[in-house]
Amino acid sequence: MTVFKAQDLVKYFGGLAAVNGVSFQVKKGEIFGLIGPNGSGKTTIFNLINNYYPLTSGDIHLYDRSIKGMKTYKICKLGIARTFQVVKPLARMTVLDNVTASAFCRVNTIKEAQKLAMETIEFCGLASYKDHKAKSLPIGLRKRLEITRALATQPKLLLLDETAAGLTPKEMGQAIELIQEINRRGVTIIIIEHIMKVIMTISHRILAINHGQPIATGTPKEIAANPQVIEAYLGEEKNAQGD
């Protein structure tokens, strides 16, 4: 069953096409990877999905329903949650309060929200930090809190943006385990990730984009061997080295 469908997504900023003709489908229970060099349009696609930016053209469907132009909070209530590459929790509030605030997307009373928040905190391994202020957490735990907040909305589709960025190897392994366990519990996932070890380990299929356009879709093995993908990443590396 197809959970999510993006049809010919286009987004212009002035005369610049940040996303141009991107189409893909995600099946129920799938972890779908989205890769590309820096500035290729990956996060812009997430911003289009939850209507942080309006589409220039194209359409987006959750199951059989178009969500194009829908308010962001309504998209969340329908079942799409996301994390952000630069995490910004409610810094002066506790972990529990942060997650409780997210839980109100799904329930109506403080008692229900706190119950859902604690269940989600325990699942994500943050129970011992529930009374800590978010601003006191190191980056690895703030990244985990970001996932926990999104998960407390009980999404059908979870969008993860650079979850592994800035993590130690141990934290990276823990993040992979958490994402896989979330997926095993029935949540479909689209993940943006720049660390190839992570994306190749957890994704069932991957879409590679460059300059806002799709260049390849396939299994991790197929993507790793694709000449256009290799060229896109080698080109980025050469530019970074000034060659």
Place the predicted regions along the sequence by residue.
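Glycine-rich phosphate-binding loops of nucleotide-dependent enzymes
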Residues: 2-243
